[in-house]
Amino acid sequence: AVGRVGALACWEHYNPLARYALMAQHEEIHCSQFPGSMVGQIFADQMEVTIRHHALEAAAFVVNATGWLDETQVAQIAPTEALRGALRGGSLTAIVTPEGRILGEPLTSGEGLVVADLDLTLVTKRKRMMDSVGHYARPELLHLVIDARPTSPMTSESGAAPHPLPAITIEETHTRDRSTSDPLAQLDHRTPITGAPAR
């Protein structure tokens, strides 16, 4: 067992509700991933701020991985040097403690691994100092609702789940009224399948 693990990718980290949902489930190890090899050093700087802030706020370790493109791959993607410049830098593979400290040496270029032992007592130590989902959260005033119920991409005005119409036959394609610009209006003559409301 390694602890409670949560994960977000790239700019999902700028959705505070998504991050808070993981905090509220008491993640201890947060796995994050950013593409890397793009935009330059500013992207790596933004990434560092983001993962260190989440580590502090969540009182969790953050294990961050970034991709890396070598020069051969960059040349295959971008035909000109001007475009290739946007595919360099911006990488920061690192592990951050719940106190916001980077463990060991981060990897900012090339392929490789960053490995560290995680002392999970630091999670408790940080939460004793400040717990974002503890009393500090003021749940009597503010709380996040996660609706895990199954949803449909469409509902009718009555609130009932939609029912599909039966398939149209080859013969019907030759007899449809082509004078109307509304193709759905041409389907009204079909009989809805069992359980579907009449149109």
Feature names for model-found ranges:
Residues 66-199:
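C-terminal beta-strand edge segments of enzyme domains
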Residues 4, 10-114:
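CN hydrolase (nitrilase-like) catalytic-core segments centered on the catalytic cysteine
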